[in-house]
Amino acid sequence: MGEQKISSLVTGGGASAGPPLGPALGPLGVNIMEVINAINDKTKDFEGMKVPVTVIVDSDTKKYEIEIGIPSAAALIMKEAGIQKGSGASGTEWAGDVTMDAVVKVANTKLENSYASSLKSVAKTIVGTCLALGVKVEGKTPKEITAEINEGKWDEKFQ
């Protein structure tokens, strides 16, 4: 029968044997709790965030492999800002503030999965996500920070 792939979005460190994973894994004959515990161990760094997970099961040998994706940029920014959700009125109301170091940290996390050509380009994308969430950067609006990035003010952060 070959390989079976099960893709799901789970809460980091909080996957359970309930839906969607348990019912999908059951018919494949693997130890469900062993798989769930392995997922929770691999996603513990993303605690509380939605993380894409793919479980690949060889239905003949019952061996499995777990691939962990990266949470969305918005989820990573909200974690850095210490907020649960965005402002709801981005551009006029502000839900939080992050440092440029936090933006660079998120940009580095997203860099390998991005189509952008440089860390600076990814950082500008992350600042755009900050705007959508209503999160300021270094106490300034994301539009001001984008202008500063374009002027080269933050270039030392992107080395």
Swiss-Prot record:
Any Gene Ontology biological process: translation
GO CC, alphabetical: large ribosomal subunit
rRNA-binding among keywords: yes
Database matches in Gene3D superfamilies: Ribosomal protein L11, C-terminal domain, Ribosomal protein L11/L12, N-terminal domain
Gene Ontology molecular function terms on file: large ribosomal subunit rRNA binding; structural constituent of ribosome
Keywords from the UniProt entry: Ribonucleoprotein, Ribosomal protein, RNA-binding, rRNA-binding
InterPro entries: Ribosomal_uL11, Ribosomal_uL11_C, Ribosomal_uL11_C_sf, Ribosomal_uL11_N, Ribosomal_uL11_N_sf
NCBIfam families xrefs: PRK01143.1 (NF002232)
Role summary: Forms part of the ribosomal stalk which helps the ribosome interact with GTP-bound translation factors.
Assembly mode: Part of the ribosomal stalk of the 50S ribosomal subunit. Interacts with L10 and the large rRNA to form the base of the stalk. L10 forms an elongated spine to which L12 dimers bind in a sequential fashion forming a multimeric L10(L12)X complex.
Family: Belongs to the universal ribosomal protein uL11 family.
Name recorded for this polypeptide: Large ribosomal subunit protein uL11
Species: Nitrosopumilus maritimus (strain SCM1)
